[in-house]
Amino acid sequence: MMFVLDSLGMLSTSKEMEDIANDKQVRDMTKSQLIKGAFRVLTLKLGQAQVPMLVTNHTYDVIGSYMPTKEMGGGTGLKYAASTIIYLTKSKERDSKKEVVGNIIKCEAKKSRLTVEGSKIATRLFFDERGLDKYYGLLELGEQYGVFQRVGNRIRIGESSVYPSAILASPDKYFTEEVMEKLEEAAKKEFSYGG
């Protein structure tokens, strides 16, 4: 079992609903306190029941900071209650005809008890039946940790050298069980505490 809340920023308080019904144009100053209190209780109860909760939320640009930064909406309740906070950004993935076929989703661990904070990874999501590309980024990770060797503009696999596009065109042929085990170890070194 898992609880999913989509989205925290779209929740309304009873005060906000009353204000809308009475045509009052006032700001709801109780929302962040209610969210903080709710997550204080939920974190304890869900932890005891060993039930994970996944929450989506929006971010906004912090005005006036020296460096441009993003912050979550809804106050600090979720920020302190969460075990993991991952910020997602996306860019369009285009094919050779310049048509949009999916998104490149970049993930940054802002807070984590499971992986190194600040670590970043990208994945690809196609809009068709291919869906989430489970091999995206593995060539680069494999090169970094010696699973693959780059020879010029090709990748050496065993005795042969292959273009990266050929590997990605038929990934099941090249990402064998043995290669995937090595990549799993590389991912642990890259993203786990204590490497």
Predicted regions: what is each one?
Residues 150-195:
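Terminal-proximal interaction/regulatory segments of ATP-powered molecular machines
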Residues 16, 61-65, 151-156:
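N-terminal cationic and glycine-rich segments that engage phosphates or anionic surfaces
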Residues 28-145:
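Phosphate-binding/switch region of NTP-binding enzymes
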Residues 13, 64, 95, 159-160:
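Short secondary-structure boundary/hinge segments and terminal tails
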Residues 2, 49, 53, 116, ...:
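Short secondary-structure junctions and interdomain/linker hinges
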Residues 21-24, 129, 161-162:
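Intrinsically disordered, low-complexity coil segments
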Residues 1-37, 41, 168:
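Conserved inter-motif catalytic segment of the P-loop NTP-binding fold
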